[in-house]
A protein has these predicted regions:
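Conserved catalytic motifs of ABC-family nucleotide-binding domains
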Residues: 165
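Helical segment within the ABC ATPase nucleotide-binding domain
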Residues: 183-196
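Helix-to-loop junction immediately C-terminal to a conserved catalytic motif
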Residues: 58
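ABC ATPase nucleotide-binding domain helical subdomain, centered on the C-loop/LSGGQ "ABC signature"
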Residues: 69, 77, 102-143, 187-188, ...
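Conserved catalytic segment of ABC-fold P-loop ATPases
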Residues: 211-218
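Conserved ABC transporter NBD signature motif
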Residues: 66-73, 83
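Catalytic Walker B motif of ABC-type/P-loop ATPase nucleotide-binding domains
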Residues: 169-173
Length: 257
């Protein structure tokens, strides 16, 4: 029996992952719950396991142990086609494929839905940018296509992640190539996801990427350290020098939202 579209929660329990074909665990002891309308920022130093966690959340990499569940069903209980409809993913290394802009946003769905393409572009705040390209949504990209800046490609890829309103959207350093206008569009997109009851997970290197989230997960050395409300992190970081406080790190602390 086909599963119903997810609409309530993502639950990660004691999850660990290693890259396919390798034996070294790069991310472990991950525990958290998010409900629809919430957004999570994942922060931590370089090589702390953030991107590996993102790949596990969307099913690109399968957990070595533990589970990732959408509305109670583990990711491997969904067919790849169904999971693809319910999950949007913007990887750290953005790639647009040979074709036009509309096809890339529609994930090469055949035929693409024009209304859904437009809605995704508007949700990503990239519609005006696209209509100013040489051929608008028909502009060719990829090999032998129009040369786009890294920021333009990243914003179009954000629209692709939002296509057809997926329940879970995972964005890995989505503003690494964005200017101030792109940052603002990203924050609006995250707030838009929350407003329609979706879940957003944002791997962040620049603070502006987490402006629209309400929870923070801290990673270090491949392990979850904390899962706390964003305000708690900001309050601790903002303590004046006369009364210094540091973020208390509790290995393996889980949480729910």
């Amino acid at each position: 029996m086909p599963l119903q579209p997810p609409s309530k929660t993502i639950v990660v329990q004691n999850a660990a992952v290693c890259p396919p074909g390798e034996q070294k665990i790069v991310c472990q002891d991950v525990n958290f719950t998010l409900t629809g309308g919430k957004a999570l920022g994942i922060i931590g130093p370089t090589a702390s396991g953030k991107s590996s966690l993102a790949r596990m959340l969307v099913g690109v990499w399968s957990p070595l142990r533990g589970t990732v569940r959408l509305d109670g069903a583990t990711l491997d209980q969904w067919s790849p086609e169904a999971l693809g409809r319910h999950v949007g993913y913007l990887p750290q290394d953005v790639e647009l494929f040979p074709g036009n802009v509309a096809q890339n946003i529609a994930r090469f769905e055949d035929p693409p839905n024009p209304e859904a393409v437009l809605a995704a572009a508007q949700a990503a705040g990239v519609h005006d940018l696209i209509v100013n390209l040489p051929d608008g949504y028909e502009t060719k990209v990829g090999e032998r296509g129009s040369a786009l800046s890294a920021g333009q490609a990243q914003r179009i890829a954000l629209a692709r992640a939002l296509y057809r309103d997926p329940f879970l959207v995972v964005l890995d350093e989505p503003n690494s190539n964005l200017d101030a206008e792109g940052d603002e569009a990203l924050t609006r997109a995250i707030l838009g996801l929350r407003a329609r009851g979706a879940i957003a997970v944002v791997v962040a290197h620049r603070p502006s990427a987490i402006a629209g989230v309400d929870y923070i997960l801290v990673m270090a050395k491949g392990r979850q350290q904390q899962f706390v409300p964003k305000e708690e992190v900001l309050t601790r970081v903002a303590q004046p020098p006369a009364a210094p406080r540091t973020l208390k790190v509790v290995p393996g602390e889980g949480g729910s939202a």
